[in-house]
Amino acid sequence: MHTFLIVLLIIDCIALITVVLLQEGKSSGFSGAISGGAEQLFGKQKQRGVDLFLNRLTIILSILFFVLMICISYLGM
């Protein structure tokens, strides 16, 4: 059981890294923060299509990561 959870954790980590790297950057760097990037921060922008899917998948994989870590640490006691 412990080995199975560790294998799931490794797969989850690889998937999480891949999904994060596939996402587009949301800011225009340091210059955007100084010269009016606040309107993007506080403006209502809806994510659509692939961006929305990648965002939700990142959240799901992150939650799965923490649940697996808690289960592995609980079984390790």
Swiss-Prot record:
Q: Its GO CC terms?
A: plasma membrane
Please provide, alphabetically and separated by semicolons, the GO molecular function terms listed in this UniProt record. Answer: protein-transporting ATPase activity
InterPro entries cross-referenced by the UniProt entry: SecG (IPR004692)
Question: What does the UniProt entry say about where the protein is found?
Answer: Cell membrane
Pfam families recorded for this chain? SecG
Membrane topology of the entry: Multi-pass membrane protein
Q: What Gene Ontology biological process does one annotation of this record name?
A: protein secretion
Stretches that traverse the bilayer: 2-22, 57-77
Query: What keywords are annotated for this sequence in UniProt?
Result: Cell membrane, Membrane, Protein transport, Translocation, Transmembrane, Transmembrane helix, Transport
Family, per the entry? Belongs to the SecG family.
This chain's function reads: Involved in protein export. Participates in an early event of protein translocation.
Its name, as the record gives it, is: Probable protein-export membrane protein SecG
Give the originating organism.
Answer: Staphylococcus aureus (strain MRSA252)
